[in-house]
Amino acid sequence: MKATGTFFFVVGPSGAGKDSLIDGARAALDGDYVFARRVITRPDGSAGEEHEGVTEAEFARRQRSGEFLVTWDAHDLRYGLPKSLMCELERGRNVVANGSRGVIAELAARLPRFVVVLVTAPHDVLARRIAARGRESGDQVASRVARAGAPVPPHVPCITVSNHSTLEAGTARFVEALRTGTRTSAAERPASRTNLMAKLRGEPLDEAAYVAVLQDAIAGRYTEAELTEFLVAATRTLTDEEVVALARARTAFTPRIDWDEPVVVDKHSMGGVPGSRITLIVVPIVAAYGLAMPKTSSRAITSAAGTADAMETIARVDLAHEDVRRCVAQARACIAWNGRLNHSVVDDVMNAITRPLRLDSRRWSVASILSKKYTAGATHVIVDLPYGPQTKLATRADAEALGALFEHVGKGLGLHVRALVTDGSGPIGRGIGPALEVRDVRLVLDNAPDAPADLRDKALRFAGEIIAFDPRVDSPEHGMQIAAALLHEGKARAAFDRIAAAQGVRCDPVAPGTHTLVVPATTRGRVAGVDGLQISGVARAAGAPRDGGAGVDMLCAIGAKVAPGQPLYRIHSDSAEALEAAAALVRAGGECCQAVRIDPD
């Protein structure tokens, strides 16, 4: 009898939460869905999923007698799905099974209605979940997260589900994917295929064409191979007007928030600069001035801290939409994690492809960034474009070109966008790591004599540009004067405290780690530069951003003369073990590979 049910094969990286979503779907779906119970060579009752535990000998016997639909090996265990699942398919029931990417091709060749469900989450979310298990070091967690899974074979239908926020939200998306997959697994080729093929030939697409392609991609009507070809073509031939069309198309998938205010401001940075925690200074200055600034920010992926990681050392950041509205009403601003707020179903699908392939998706990202700013209700956006050897933008020319594109696309969306090119050649501020960066922020807000001047100056520049969005302010220079006065008079610090209180102040603010090690100069000379990638690597080895108190405190300035034994930077950690891991990384660097470069006088 021909199988009529759909077989859903669930795959995804460690930390994505596949088992939790499957459990949630089991409770939500009716009897038309059967959830496979895997046979595993480990005892019944072991930690993890409910399974049938068997011995190695019993597993081998069943395999010889043909009792398995498919088998695979992983983590020194053997896994099998029983052949009896075929009977469920023949009865018209849909089967949901958790499995390995390595057997997708084998199953797809045997099952006429077969859909892969790829569960994903941003790298920072995966890292936090894996780290919470307490079984791996910071470097091991980073290595596991960076590991790219095998691609889904060509022509196999694949639906991507992002499980990045709450279990309830992830389960709802997972259940909808199963329902969508049931409807589309045997459907005809998508109507938007002519648009996709046109892009593969290098032809431009308009807004309607992008909407059609994205709708079919979200519904799982394209294979991963087809979407990969599409994205590769788009990174090569995406014109400026197409970026506008793509940005406008993306806004069709998320309703826009209405703040009922003439000016709602936001900020975005392309990142890549250690420290540089200006958002925690800019937002309270702007709030003190009176403009609404509901700022959502990311956690760190490969750096030592993200804005959300830093803010979380003093206040709650996992805000829901109603929390953001309340904070803006009470304090005129918030600094929240974007994981619960700026979800994009389009990014769920596309990021799962672009990240492992390391595609140059900067132009695509402009559409993504600005479409999310638009749907979040912003009217005016400022963009920080740092350039330097270890940032996403290698040269000033690269940054200027991308800045022009940001402003052009913003205009196409009806947004006022101002892009600023900044120096990203080295760290800004002294602290690198969540609590250390917040210490620098507090020094600036408190007008302390030892506040990092570079951090203060950059924050005032951006705050001035934002304040100048107000039609009553005639220039960015005037805006910067207003910003400096708000900072000097303590109004920015008061606004910062109001924002933290509205979000929920931590009763135990995270302090810099008490396990410390000073790294001294080994030669005489002048500090010529700081390698941002290496210094962030040391901070991560010490535990940042997972441990909020971990990081690096810079004790020398560019251009300063140093002698052997003079402190260059201090490593902070929350444990002796993590401190030793960071120290070992420093020792392994040797003279030719140091975070602080010293040139002879």
UniProtKB/Swiss-Prot annotation:
* InterPro entries, per the entry: Glycosyl_Trfase_fam3, Nuc_phospho_transferase, P-loop_NTPase, PhnN, PYNP-like_C_sf, PYNP_C, Pyrmidine_PPase_CS, Thym_Pase_Put
Q: In which pathway does it act?
A: Metabolic intermediate biosynthesis; 5-phospho-alpha-D-ribose 1-diphosphate biosynthesis; 5-phospho-alpha-D-ribose 1-diphosphate from D-ribose 5-phosphate (route II): step 3/3
Which key words tag this protein in UniProt? Alkylphosphonate uptake, ATP-binding, Glycosyltransferase, Multifunctional enzyme, Nucleotide-binding, Transferase
Keyword ATP-binding recorded: yes
> Per the record, which residues fall in region Thymidinephosphorylase?
178-601
Which E.C. number(s) belong to this protein?
2.7.4.23, 2.4.2.4
Question: Is ATP-binding there in the keyword field?
Answer: yes
Report a single Gene Ontology molecular function: ATP binding
SUPFAM superfamilies from the UniProt entry: Nucleoside phosphorylase/phosphoribosyltransferase catalytic domain, P-loop containing nucleoside triphosphate hydrolases, Pyrimidine nucleoside phosphorylase C-terminal domain
Catalytic function, reaction form = alpha-D-ribose 1,5-bisphosphate + ATP = 5-phospho-alpha-D-ribose 1-diphosphate + ADP; thymidine + phosphate = 2-deoxy-alpha-D-ribose 1-phosphate + thymine
Fetch the Pfam families from UniProt.
Glycos_transf_3, PYNP_C
Spell out the residue ranges making up region: Ribose 1,5-bisphosphokinase.
1-177
SMART domains named in the record = PYNP_C
- Which GO BP terms apply? 5-phosphoribose 1-diphosphate biosynthetic process; organic phosphonate metabolic process; organic phosphonate transport; pyrimidine nucleobase metabolic process; pyrimidine nucleoside metabolic process
A GO cellular component term found in this entry reads: cytosol
Q: What does this protein do?
A: Catalyzes the phosphorylation of ribose 1,5-bisphosphate to 5-phospho-D-ribosyl alpha-1-diphosphate (PRPP).
Family in the record: In the N-terminal section; belongs to the ribose 1,5-bisphosphokinase family. In the C-terminal section; belongs to the thymidine/pyrimidine-nucleoside phosphorylase family. Type 2 subfamily.
Q: Which NCBIfam families match?
A: phosphon_PhnN (TIGR02322), PRK04350.1 (NF003338)
Name of the molecule in the record: Bifunctional ribose 1,5-bisphosphokinase-thymidine phosphorylase
The gene name reads phnN
